[in-house]
């Protein structure tokens, strides 16, 4: 095929540069010559055209030719090179300015030398002229100008001054030439140029005219040129070292130099002019200037002639104009510096330790939480905190940072973490850690997370070796900051904690107390026994130690974990909860009896303080042993933990009771049964029940508490006889659809087939089922309702812990999501695989929505803080709507357990608020006193928080701060909350103490029983007790026997408290309609006893008050009946059955015993009788067990040894399940 010819360019028809036709072939290049080498042009040698190829002559044939291009040729000129050396180059120009500054200082020094060597009394005259003597006549008004015009200058001094003047003149001319920009007059009339000419040209003239060598030249004016050179030199110096935050330093330097120049000019000027007067010395003139400028004016030295007087006036006027301007600029810069915070010096960063706190906006609550928690650790007292925030300090933060306690340790810098200059100011690369916190009160929390992510990236880019501690809000954004050393996701922890609150009461309080640093001294001055006990146990935290270095645990090397946990608690009062192998990074909570301890293991334990700060007082231990064996003081109540020495022996716990019967003491309002008889064996009360010893090594028959895989009998679902529902088989597996990247896989109970989206809607029927209300579903267990604004990805973490594989299938509670907005498709896809999970659109402030979602059949209601209300125009008002709505629900549904999330922890005092409650006022005073004492847990005595009924996510901020010292705290917290699952690690659950368990008597004996029978580790108690909240204890008294009547009908006090694991749900007031008349009769009996006691125990005034309370109770009861009628009418209007509400609307005395700071029936009769609940973390071994106690347990992983021992478990599980994992949860048929 013939090749097509390229069309000719217009230039091809013209002659080439060498005169040859364009069409002629170009000379071939030598063989082997690279076409990349520059081609040699043809034509004559002198032809400029032959050396450079024209731009328009780039044809196809010349495209391979190259032209060497030289850049920045404009800088090759002589002027540009001089400009580069004298002006542009930072280091060379700095040297030039330093030389110029030294030159000016030298001229001022030479002037002072000339003044000191000059003596006017020896004669005055020009160079080589005859000298004339002059004496001042004070009476004459004429001035002899000769002493002012002529001075005595030595030859050597003159020569030096001439040389310096010539150098200064030449340098000035050169700089004028280099900085010339077209306007010469601008250069000439500059003050610095005029001064240069005045001080240099006369010296140059004296070279050619010798008589003028004694002419006076005001060389002292060079001080102003020196000041100008110093300013330029400092600017160049800062530019050379890349220091940009130097305005304050420059202004201070300018002000100081201005003052110095004014004084020096006035001193030298007055001294010279007074040569025609009294001939003042330089020192006297300096004294006069200082006295005059300081406005003192003694009058002992005064100028005598008018020129010197005129100079003084001029100098004062200049000072009055210049100095205020300088001071104004200095004050302005100082105020700006106060706002921006200045710098953290490099020297301090290298010699001191500091951490950096990066926040979007700094609020006083966040600041104090951080400072109190960070500086609660003794080894952090010498650390500095540098706060980097883009906003100005508000008034409250500024006031706090001016307190001497914080002003010496906290440095506030206004700046952005995205700017390297601000990170340099904070010396991020030298920091020990960087905490990056998100602004949770923003309306757009996703945008707040994005800002946090960028800050984390910026810090990692600038200081890759600085440890990062990042707080993120949304779980879907967590994977962007996985590179950080420690990450806390707020919504993950929040929802998991609220979920556990439904099955393990007050988990939020338990975790909050664990992650706060405390010495256990809160409430120790309170007269209330429960406050002292609660405050003392709140000081327990998680610590770690290497087993081989531990006095607590090293004696148990080679023993089982369970054996070590029990004996360490028995001997030292410490609670061993987990460990970590040296060759494994995973932390295992309660790995079980088959785990043998090694010296290299890292042990994690709960105690008041770490072992290194503990003292061992063995003498007291021996005394207490003797007392224990003699039967004295064994059951006198909870032992007091020593605070100063922290750890001493808790005494040996006797494992056999000393008697067959014991009447508990009534202390501080705690109540129990009148008689607690021990169970008998073979019909005889002579034998005491025994507890099996904890084995050093687990034998083959040792069982974990509940093996959910090998024993399926527990999970077999019995079809309901009256409902006729089809049995749905559940499977165990991992959820197939995670709503976000980075969620930890957890083995859960799942549906074998995903439920259609239409079946997830609770209040609307579909083609698969026609149920439109909760009762129609016929749930065996009570509902858990979650009220949230949107179905965010964090809500997924509420469901997973409640559907984890280790939860008994018979204990799974139906979950109803009450959402303000319709969930999206991705969220429904994630939850459709879980059994008994439904949603409904509605709001918590709408009664119809609450009734439709089945609130009267609910066991727990969780009210999640709404994102749209987290920010308010007025501080702390963000929770107003939530608080009022929850208060309304308490009035409408008093038997419901409600857990509320608040934005601000300080607002928890408004939960279940009663204005005339004297006990709440007393607690408020206690909180203020604890806050004044510097406690980190001042809010802990608020009854809603102590009972776990209120929670704020800001309480968990300390988890991130505490991780700086304890890098394992986030991992342990996530394991306890069920967010992470590690093979072989246990999980948190709870067990309820019933009257049948009271024979165990003490917490230490319970510890032994659980360790020996089911390998469970108890870590605390959730206690509910009655309390008399009265100003006069004699006014109203409640006998324990009065409570026994109701307990005989409804069971133990804590039967309404939801538990998890093997513990069971709460009884409702309407389990059997037939029992309500009996309960109401018991309530009336209680009221009659109360009415009989009141007149006896009080005088006439008390009786009158009692009568007024009775009248008030009648009014309140009518109010409750009105609310009840309102609810029933709405239920009838919606087509819902009212039988359930009729049952639960009537509360009895035992209901009150199970409510936290509630109890409308008894409380309306008198405002003093009530109950309270609180958490005891790791109580002493001899702490008395009480009915209604709920014990927190860490249960071993049931999958830990399935492969090795499934057969042995199967054979022996049948006769041990009744004792190891008792079923105490009553199933309520709806």
Swiss-Prot record:
PROSITE patterns: RCK_N (PS51201)
Membrane topology field: Multi-pass membrane protein
Tissue specificity: Highest expression in liver, brain and spinal cord. Lowest expression in skeletal muscle.
Pfam families: BK_channel_a, Ion_trans_2, Slo-like_RCK
Result of altering residue 541 to D/N/A: Dramatically reduced the Na(+) sensitivity of KCNT1
Binding annotation for K(+) 2: 778, 787, 818, 820, 842, 865
Compartmental location: Cell membrane
Sugar-modified residues: 133, 137
Activation and inhibition: Activated by high intracellular Na(+). In addition to activation by Na(+), is cooperatively activated by intracellular Cl(-) levels. Inhibited by Zn(2+). Activated upon stimulation of G-protein coupled receptors, such as CHRM1 and GRIA1.
UniProt feature: intramembrane region: 282-302
Transmembrane segments: 94-126, 154-178, 193-208, 216-233, 247-274, 305-338
Record-linked PANTHER family: CALCIUM-ACTIVATED POTASSIUM CHANNEL ALPHA CHAIN, POTASSIUM CHANNEL SUBFAMILY T MEMBER 1
Quaternary structure annotation from Swiss-Prot or TrEMBL: Homotetramer; which constitutes the Na(+)-activated K(+) channel. Interacts with KCNT2; these heterodimer channels differ from the homomers in their unitary conductance, kinetic behavior, subcellular localization, and response to activation of protein kinase C. Interacts (via C-terminus) with FMR1; this interaction alters gating properties of KCNT1. Interacts with CRBN via its cytoplasmic C-terminus.
Name listed for the protein in its UniProt record: Potassium channel subfamily T member 1
